[in-house]
Amino acid sequence: MERRHLLIIGAPRTGTTLLATMISRHTEIAVLNEDKGWSMRKLLGKVIVGNKRCIPNQIEIKRRSRLNSRLWKKMGLAKEYQSSQFSIEDYLTLPHIKVIGIIREGNDAILSGMRRGKKSFRGAAYRWCRAIEIIHELTVRFPEAVLVVSFEDLVVHPKENMERVAAFLNIDYQDRMLEGPVYNPWYPESGMNEEKINRSQKEKIDYNLAELFPSADAQYRKLLSLCQTTPLPEPEQRKNG
């Protein structure tokens, strides 16, 4: 049986580790956490092997320039330094490659990036915008090879999303995939924590992303329409809800 490959991507603070852990609970899948190379190809006994990388601080659509270095970032000459030896385009050359991108509401992702990630607004916003741009580009260029998952929808509808993932990867769904939160290496919890969604709304924080970053905001909304497990309410219902 020829091995299949998987790349899980998303901006920092958007649920990449949770998603990767849930997927890796499947008995036929093994996912490495933020490996810089292709060590996943050395894994044995699994149908699907993969890696999880964050955009844009760990991986970009194209391989970084040889001139790019961490020093450039420290000096303010580069926004990010991609630690990955390989680009997303490099991953796309692997046989039977699938890409799963996770997206999170921008205000929440940026707020978490500032609080937990200790980034400035500018830095956290850039990471979210760039991840959205790349995931959107991938859905346009490689629609059959890319699946998009919403962090909020994953938390509220974990089984439905894992069923989507399993179907996308052409494997049988397993209930053990729902055990992901327990095995999350950084933030273990007994189950899905719905307190992590819509935090900015609860705190009445609005960064006006549609005005500051209109392109990324529009792309996010397009991506969101691709990853709902339940129908989106009509505009009037959302207004009255």
Where are the language model's segments positioned?
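PAPS-dependent sulfotransferases, especially Golgi type II membrane carbohydrate sulfotransferases
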Residues: M1-L7, A167, I171-G241
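PAPS-dependent sulfotransferase catalytic core
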Residues: M1-W72, Y183-M192, R199
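Generic detection of long, well-ordered alpha-helical segments
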Residues: R13, A125, V155, K159, ...
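Residue-level detector of alpha-helix boundaries and kinks
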Residues: T14, K119-S120, S150, I205-N208
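Alpha-helix C-terminal capping segments
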Residues: I23, W38-L44, Y91, T139-F142, ...
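A local structural micro-motif
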Residues: V31-L32, L147, Q174, P235
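PAPS-dependent sulfotransferase catalytic domain
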Residues: G50, C54-R176, G191-S200
